[in-house]
């Protein structure tokens, strides 16, 4: 598979290629215009060939979200269904998750925008009114303004499990708040779909000690990427494109909860690693 890594910076884009060790700076158009070109892979190839080489270590990275919305799909893995049923059984909400896992229509909800997004090296937040907070590592799709899957990045769907478990209708409060949408570090643009064997790996460190590690393959998803894209774009248009987190099954078990200062590392190759600190 050939690919380009597209990084957003304050002054333009930095592009890396699977066939080179160079980092190339490109400043020909806005982020929104560039990523919504009809053939983004070819656009990256052209920009890489005609740009200026830079030292990647000197680059200040921004999250890959400008005017895009961020959406998320839930209960797309079996383990996610089981976990959601367990956390919500006391409220009687467990049947909701059982039904949505097998239903024709997936769960899709609004996650945030550029204002609420946190990029690589940034600080994600946990709610002050929640006692059970976890990160959820998710392969995230970029869907362009034509409604086509055009790239991939890494998502960290910060979640307040006790709030969601209390009542499924509280999901927007459990999932959508300032600093709850981790995303980055780049937009991966490929010449073919990611392999089913692609691994999502998450590690959490506290005071320098690893306190959680979990991983899965995207082949464990019940729903296809095409299916999720079709449902999201069925009655909605996105003039600047949109991001769609695709769900997770790698979540720390109760009673683990995040604390301020925890370091979250989510790796999905060949995208890279998204590293964030809990504020």
Q: Which residues make up each language-model segment?
A:
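Generic recognition of flexible, low-complexity loop/linker segments
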Residues: 4, 128-129, 252-254
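Catalytic-pocket segment enriched in acidic/His residues
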Residues: 161-279
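Generic N-terminal segment detector
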Residues: 1-70, 227, 276-279
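Short acidic-glycine loop/turn motifs at beta-strand connectors
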Residues: 10-11, 17-22, 143-148, 205-208, ...
């Amino acid at each position: 598979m050939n690919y380009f890594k597209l990084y957003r910076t304050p002054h333009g884009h930095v592009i890396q290629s699977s066939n080179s060790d160079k980092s190339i700076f490109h400043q020909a158009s806005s982020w929104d215009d560039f990523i919504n070109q009809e053939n983004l892979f070819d656009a990256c190839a052209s920009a890489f060939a005609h740009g200026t080489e830079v030292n990647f270590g000197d680059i200040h990275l921004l999250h890959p979200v400008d005017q895009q919305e961020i959406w998320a799909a839930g209960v797309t893995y079996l383990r996610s269904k089981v976990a959601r049923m367990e956390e919500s059984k006391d409220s009687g909400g467990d049947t909701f998750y059982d039904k949505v896992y097998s239903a024709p229509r997936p769960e899709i909800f609004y996650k945030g925008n550029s204002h609420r997004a946190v990029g690589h090296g940034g600080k994600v937040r946990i709610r002050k009114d929640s006692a059970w907070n976890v990160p959820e590592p998710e392969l995230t799709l970029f869907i362009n303004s034509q409604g086509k899957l055009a790239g991939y990045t890494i998502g960290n769907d910060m979640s307040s499990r006790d709030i969601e478990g209390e009542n499924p209708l509280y999901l927007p409060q459990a999932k959508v708040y300032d600093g709850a949408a981790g995303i980055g570090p780049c937009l991966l643009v490929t010449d073919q779909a990611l392999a089913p064997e692609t691994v999502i790996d998450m590690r959490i460190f506290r005071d320098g000690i690893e306190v959680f590690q979990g991983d899965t393959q995207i082949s464990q998803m019940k729903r296809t990427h095409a299916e999720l894209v079709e449902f999201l774009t069925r009655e909605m248009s996105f003039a600047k494109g949109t991001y769609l987190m695709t769900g997770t099954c790698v979540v720390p078990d109760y009673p683990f909860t995040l604390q301020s200062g925890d370091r979250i590392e989510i790796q999905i190759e060949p995208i890279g690693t998204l590293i964030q600190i809990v504020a």
